[in-house]
């Protein structure tokens, strides 16, 4: 008789955003006349930049001719894209990252879930609390998190690093030493950031205790303040302790195109074994490469026109963030984020739970957001709104919320 991976049975309910989708669909079916504004899931709404569309058209045309047709992509990504990433995202910032330390994939979500394949199940993970739920859920699937404790909304074998208003929604070094540390800055969901000096403390700590940092920098393009690092490799010693995850979804609107990359320096080792070699083996075995046309589109993001056009889109979303932030403040809400990230983190009013406020906004204002408790136990009593809607819908949503 075959057996299943019973770690999946430990997972509570469905994935956060799947649960939200089901609740919204049920409400819409019962109230077909209501116009629902979605400021929940972090999906973009603006079209792809013209430079990206031009690259897609050109590469699709190439696929129509035998002499320029491309089949399977190289395991680790085409050289033209990896070089563009290394030059623009790292060398221009003074970071020693080479093209052959970059692994192209179909997105940061896939990589954040798959990176655990190269680590022993015995490793203990530490996560910011609250944080993107994929980190914990995928480690639970692998059997790394112990048992789920419903009354605590937490796992028994996870080191939670509370990110609360008292700490400016940034984590403090954990008292219990973990093996794998997940950091996400600018943070999803709180929108918080840390300075380069603060990040350096984490790098020094990881090197001291022999931990590895998995650094999710999916939102680095939204950074506006000069003392906030765009990559962990701006910190001295990061090459020996850090893996960085990046995405084209938020900086270039590739949510429907799918492209990302992971950086693993060759200096990052466990004993004599490089994590670079392990991930290369895993990547080559389980992934057949991002499509040629998508990688050409990614290359176009780094062109002069691509940078200008995607920069304008980022400014559009950050104007939405400013609108939400200022609108909620004027309505008396306690809010943060929205400065270096497209997320606004607000305290629920009248001591409502996160899900109570979700239902309240949906039913009374027909606005969808994300319950903070879905990101971890310290997210209870908070709520996330995204700036990825249209400006018109953002303004309309704020008018409805302020009228409550």
Curated annotation (Swiss-Prot):
Entry's Gene Ontology molecular function annotations: L,L-diaminopimelate aminotransferase activity; pyridoxal phosphate binding
Amino-acid positions noted as binding pyridoxal 5'-phosphate in the UniProt annotation, renumbered to this chain: 72, 108-109, 132, 188, 219, 247-249, 258, 288
Record PTM N6-(pyridoxal phosphate)lysine, positions in chain: 250
Binding-site list for substrate: 15, 42, 109, 132, 188, 288, 384
Bilayer-crossing regions: none
Pathway where this protein functions: Amino-acid biosynthesis; L-lysine biosynthesis via DAP pathway; LL-2,6-diaminopimelate from (S)-tetrahydrodipicolinate (aminotransferase route): step 1/1
Keywords: Aminotransferase, Pyridoxal phosphate, Transferase
Pfam families: Aminotran_1_2
GO biological process entries: lysine biosynthetic process via diaminopimelate, diaminopimelate-aminotransferase pathway
Cofactors: pyridoxal 5'-phosphate
Catalyzed reactions: (2S,6S)-2,6-diaminopimelate + 2-oxoglutarate = (S)-2,3,4,5-tetrahydrodipicolinate + L-glutamate + H2O + H(+)
Annotated EC: 2.6.1.83
NCBIfam families for the chain: DAPAT_plant
Entry function: Involved in the synthesis of meso-diaminopimelate (m-DAP or DL-DAP), required for both lysine and peptidoglycan biosynthesis. Catalyzes the direct conversion of tetrahydrodipicolinate to LL-diaminopimelate.
Family: Belongs to the class-I pyridoxal-phosphate-dependent aminotransferase family. LL-diaminopimelate aminotransferase subfamily.
Subunit structure: Homodimer.
Name of the featured protein: LL-diaminopimelate aminotransferase
